[in-house]
Amino acid sequence: MAGIGVKLQKIYDRRTILANLAGFGYSTMVTIAPMFVVIGNVMLMSHFLGYETVGYARRGLFSGTVLYIFIFSLLVAAPFNAVLSRYMSDIIYEEKYEDILPCYDVGLFLNICFGCLFAIPFCIREYLKGQVDLVFVFTGFCGFISLLLVFYSMLYLSICKDYQKISLFFLMGMAAAFGLAWLLVKVFHRDIIYSMLLSLTIGFFLTAAISAATIKSYFKRNSRQYRKVLHYFKIYWHLIATNLLYTLGLYIHNFIFWTTDLKMTVAHTFVYAPAYDMATCLAMFTNLSSTIIFIRRVEMHFHERYKAYSEAVIGGRWEDIKNAKNK
């Protein structure tokens, strides 16, 4: 399953300014395009559907719901994905491709259960204490689970080196979300905030469903060796803690500021600091170029050189090993 390295190499081999721009654009498309697609979709919906005409409290409820959906779906997926990624790497190396579907099924079950463990009590609090409409609460819950499944499916598509399809699936899901939101607001005259949340939820679910179908099309055989997957969680429990703490470190500063005077509380449930959260979002944008450059260099140079080094270690001479290592 070819990655993007071969295509990037062909682009950069032309050695022209236009080729460099094309290579950078292609790298951007397959690395950070999904994030920009979601952000762009929310901005377009806000602009064309009259988001600014909605009351401040309703806008705060929508912002808090979307913010929590993104942050906590990523945090919930983090502990399991590290171990599952290790398991996937091992079985791919051993060429036991029939063990991939059991890994997918176990991970899917664990992510949903773990997500519900935290989301259901939160939603109950949102409904009872925050007096938020039950339909709105349930839609937010479905959006959280759907995005959780999207992040989980991205693990398998990334291992398959199918970065282009990840971007394409996000584009399809968000295009459907924008179209549905436009239809609900402009044609059926439904509530703007709920229409946007419902449309985003359906868009995330569509992205997750297409991703799952693609994974199933890649790996058709199922060994049903589910215990082997669970055994890895016992062996590599430290990966669970490491990846959770790493992901938590990305947002812990936000959580700290949510306890300061900058915080805003919506519906006695959602707590966030809009000023600081916006500042960290803008700061994140300044680092996107490094992400693109890193992925490009890994895809174009690291994989092939690491493969050559591994082959030299297995059956090469000492000189071959040293030469491969120095590269």
Predicted regions and their residues:
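N-terminal membrane topogenesis motif
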Residues: M1-M43, G60-L61, R227-L239, A324-K327
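Small-residue-rich midsections of specific transmembrane alpha-helices
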Residues: S63-S89, T247, Y251, T280-H303
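Membrane-interface junctions at transmembrane-helix termini in multi-pass inner-membrane proteins
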Residues: L148-L168
